[in-house]
Amino acid sequence: MRIDEVLIYEERLNAKPIISAAIIKLDKVFKDNNHEMRIVGGAVRDIALGKSPKDIDFATDATPDEMMAILDKAGIRHKPTGLEHGTITAILDNEPFEITTLRADTETDGRHAEVEFVKSWEEDAKRRDLTYNAMSMDIEGNVYDYFGGMDDLQDKVSKFVGDAEERITEDYLRILRYFRFQGRLSKPTWDNDTLEAITKHAKGLSGISAERIWQEMSKVLSGQNVASVVSMIEKTGVSKVIGLSTNNANTLKDKSNPVLALAQLDNSVDLAKRWKFSNNETQLLNFLIKHKNNPLDQKKVEDMIADGVDKDLVNTDAQVPDFPITGADLIAKGMKPGPEMGATLNKLKQQWKASNFTATKDELLNATS
């Protein structure tokens, strides 16, 4: 419904878990100076999906100069971390808060945008990519939804803000961002008009740097619904533009690490060169290819990566380590089979992982003494 010319979603979100005392104080400081501060972007989307946001971004109708004056007046430390973009970082209770002035695009070239500072929340929302990324929320949980983002989340569909072709041609990387976010939805619905716009402008990705392509594709490949998302990347012609071979969808399975996912593809080595993998990523890919026909080794590598092992340990000559403790070792130390033994084995395995898989059998057994 529209209240005071602002579209507010009919139900409040539960914002309490992320609203700290520092955020409440910052909000009051802006209000006391006749300005507004809201949570914007991905944090609002994640809360609406019942997820805990990793990062919280804030926006305000105050200009950077006004922000700094407001924070100075309140005795709050701050740093001009991105003045050209209108971003000030306020530091309160030893916690940084990035606050950005509302902006509107004045000029775009398919890769970057020139912006100007504005006072309109709706104008700022217009420059964002997808409807559910264009929402903002106050600390009470009121959602300001100008383009139907909440409805799209409920319908499990991703749509561009306003005209899809305009949003895409402003920054062609938005095509891959679309697929990345679509993959995050549970059993997503595909919007035909959006797919037509992507198909029409897929070639625009040829002007995007390899690093930016991989940055987005790595998130696509480590997300959910990878097979269905890649299938649609192929159907829209995007795969040909970015170098992804076709007919991969049926072979792809969801993986926690993008290199693990990419290793399933026939042209993974060529893609690694084209997308300019880091040295660590290249070493990991070569290792995975070397052990491709050994499912046991593959599983161990996946466990290692999932547990955060330093990728430097995984190189072309590496041997995948075996957990050195068995139930027989614990029985030999006098432990009886049962739940306690299982718990001890799990505890020792966690210690072994914490050592980057270097702790010896004796060291681990001594830890049980």
Language model regions located:
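Catalytic cores of the polymerase beta-like nucleotidyltransferase superfamily
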Residues: 2-369
